Amino acid sequence: MIERFNSQFAHPEGWVGRFVGTILALKNRERNAWTISILNIQPDDQVLEIGFGPGQAIQEVAKLTPNGFVAGIDLSDVMVAQASKRNAAAIRSGHVLLQQGAESPLPFEDNKFNKVFAVNSMQFWSNPIAGLQEVRRVLKPGGRVVITIQPMWAKTEEEVQIVAEKLVFQLKQVGFKQVRLETRQIKPITTVSGMGIK
């Protein structure tokens, strides 16, 4: 039962998935706000979120991009439904587009977005390197990616550091430049955010 519940965070389904969406909306608020601040979003930016969950960050980014466009992709039909309800007006106006799908391949053309981000979803990607390659493909030259992970499985700060170093390595491996890492103390354990430029 516990394994089934935990698996819902990777791919929320059914009534348990709807409950998980409520939890994610509460738990990810601070991580979302921090990630969005690192992105330095401009009013005309084209922004993509991978693994948008209940759609809170999509909603916030839409407010920051009155002359731009916001897209999101998530594996879970339950999360797509919740996020679509939360962002209904922006979807109707064409400002926001939400789709069900995986991080690889991304259903967008090359050089589409100025900013791409993921909050607590990369750890569930089936192939992180392929996913990051896709992120780089859809980013415009000079575009920015921010990947935020709070490794809840880590028992020590040393384990968090391993996650951070791996994230930096992966960003560099697929060709991102000016890769840097930021950390933030968000209970119960340190959150890491890796940023790179195409």
Predicted segments with their positions:
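A short acidic, Gly/Pro-enriched loop at the edge of an enzyme's catalytic core
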Residues: 104-115
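N-terminal, positively charged/glycine-rich alpha-helical extensions of SAM-dependent methyltransferases
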Residues: 1-16
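Conserved beta-strand signature within the Rossmann-like core of class I S-adenosyl-L-methionine
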Residues: 142-150
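Core SAM-dependent methyltransferase catalytic element
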Residues: 185-198
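A short SAM/SAH-binding and catalytic strip from SAM-dependent methyltransferases
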Residues: 115-127
